[in-house]
Amino acid sequence: MPGDQAFGQEEAALFALPPDISRCVAGRITDSERASVLTTLNEIRAAHGVPPVTYDRSSEDETMAAALMMAANGQLSHQPPTNWRCYSVPGAVGAGSSNLAGGMVSPYLAFSTSREYLVGWLTDVRNMMRGTGHRRWLLSPFVTQVAFGRVGGQTADGNRTSAAVLKTFKFASEPPPSGPVPDFVAYPFGDYPQRFYQQGALLSFSPIVDKVNRWNNLKVDLARARVIVSTAGGVVPSRIESRSNLGVGYATALEFSAGSLVAGTPYHVEITGLSYNGEPLNYAYDFTLDNSAGP
């Protein structure tokens, strides 16, 4: 099939030790792939004023085992059943504490770089459950380390498969944030690289009221929240899609839509009606999609 050889070569280049899905061998990614993932993730976090994370190599066995299960079964699950092909306890732990992507077996599957997987988690446009859960883990200032895994290649019957996993919590130890914690995390924010945005992505806002005890941030009341998005031309129609306090990323989140954003246009966002321990909270910030900030 045209392109099969190229797909296999692109997948193979990611590994220092190639995976063998038929034998349930996860393999090992290269040092350069590991470094590239960490660099890209910290580039994304920096665009939001969030401190960088470190890489926990000791957790990579979990993420590689989880990616192996997703690739072998052609599905994604945070709670994989024990009868799955290539099931393992480390893989199940990794699956339950990570962002997941891929998990598809098809002769037509296109190759995705790990950077594309990261941006996919950031935009959350293809999230199977509408919302910004993957994004909130990527951007949480209280996530201070990660581990990555991916497994892919061609199957014996000529199909293609690939899966990626990013562990963000349930580490043996979790150091404090490596830098100042912002007052809020918003998407998009500031002069924002357009390569990190995709039309159709929900906008989001998470207030950080306690920079020490992360769990206190779940007590922010969003019930009366209002969002106003505007440009120099006036108010942009917007709608709150969700008010979430489920603990994802250790913060509440407003998820809202504002139509199709235009690159180069400055947007102003006002968030009002929030409260914490009975005290009102109001926020304002600006963003512009910048298509000149790199590839």
Give each language-model segment a name.
Residues 14-15, 38, 64, 76-94, ...:
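Extracytoplasmic/secretory soluble proteins
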